Amino acid sequence: VNTMRQQGNIWGSYAKDRDGWLTDEIREYIKDKSEYAYFPGCTASFVEQDVAQSTALILKEAGVEYSYIGKDEQCCGIPMLVSGRWEVFDETAAKNIESMKKLSANTIITTCPACWLVWEIYYRHWAEERGIDYPFHAKHYADVLAELIEEGKFKLTGDIGRKVTYHDPCHMGRAGVRYEGPRTLIEAIPGSNFREMRFNKQEAHCCGAVLTLVADPDVAEIIGAKRIQEAIDTGADTLITACPCCRVQLKRSRDLQGLPIEIRDLSTLVAESLGYNIPESNAVIDEKWGVFEQMIRLMTPWGMADLMADMIPELINAMPDMYRSMMNMVIKAPDVFKEPMISMMTNVMPSLFPKLMPDIMPKV
């Protein structure tokens, strides 16, 4: 919550670095005001910058002019919404809507399906409930490009020489009922050799990202591995998705399980077909998610227990003399006496420790 309020994202990154994904070519193309505005979202801005860059360059190649909020962009707020911190979501919605109005845009193009869902549905409801003017509609980049392809205004020519299958993100599919845009875009890529998984569209299995991954990484690994195996069963060599968070989860599950398939975001394959050679963000994904996962595991009861176990010598040394002597006596006592002594302390420590911790922790 503090990171959201202070830095506008949940990845622990600095707000000043939000536009760090911009290349000179993209920066020069961005308009001050435009009918379209690009909203990369947190994961594409801070973690999967190859996705943000690919999307921005694809839109440029398709002739779509767009503006961009830049450093003032905030997280869409959906993590706060689903975790019940509605007051933080309120603050975020107000900031983003105000910033977007300054760009004079009426169509917001997103990289992330969750951001699309928020801009198209949740922000609209939020604004209507408060009597605030809301002149926006949102589209995922895949839908924008699919429309241009169907109108004959955008064509891909570079053969990528792959066998691909597609994972439907839950926010885009089940929640948003957006299935055809990504498929139109995939099939327009020469050499994509697209094949569907057995469970697709409204029947597509979740990859295990978002709430599952945050709540229980071990369960998420199993869910992700099952989804990846479905992709492998199609004979595909590349599993693509149109959601940065799905990519993080699928890549993590693949790496942990050692499964033989490449994980890519759709935007990066389109950019590849257009001749762009954009460096992949896999190392950053590993680094950022590694820190995130350590914090998730630390906040579990067993994680805190392991941490406290490692810190016991330092905690004891930082205690007032009386308690330090008592704890050392317990530690040095023969086993036959140790268990009864610990049992006696069990009723005392839950009330005693909160009083001791403010003095102990600064010393530790």
Question: Which residue ranges define each predicted feature?
Answer:
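Iron-sulfur-cluster electron-transfer modules
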Residues: V1-A127, D133, L148, E287-F353, ...
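Short, surface-exposed connector motifs at secondary-structure boundaries
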Residues: E35, K101-N106, V164, A231-D237
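Short, flexible loop segments at boundaries between secondary-structure elements
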Residues: R130-G158, F199-Q202, D255-E293
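Hydrophobic alpha-helical packing residues
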Residues: L59, I186-E187, R254
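Redox- and metal-dependent alpha/beta enzyme cores, enriched for Fe-S-associated oxidoreductases
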Residues: E150-F154, V164-D218, D306
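Local cysteine-cluster metal-coordination motifs and their immediate loop/turn environment
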Residues: F39-S45, K71-G84, I109-I121, H167-G176, ...
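A short, acidic, amphipathic alpha-helical segment used as a generic capping/interface helix at domain edges
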Residues: D218-D237
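A polyampholytic, Gly/Pro-enriched intrinsically disordered region
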Residues: E87-A94, F154-D168, L213-I223, E280-P301
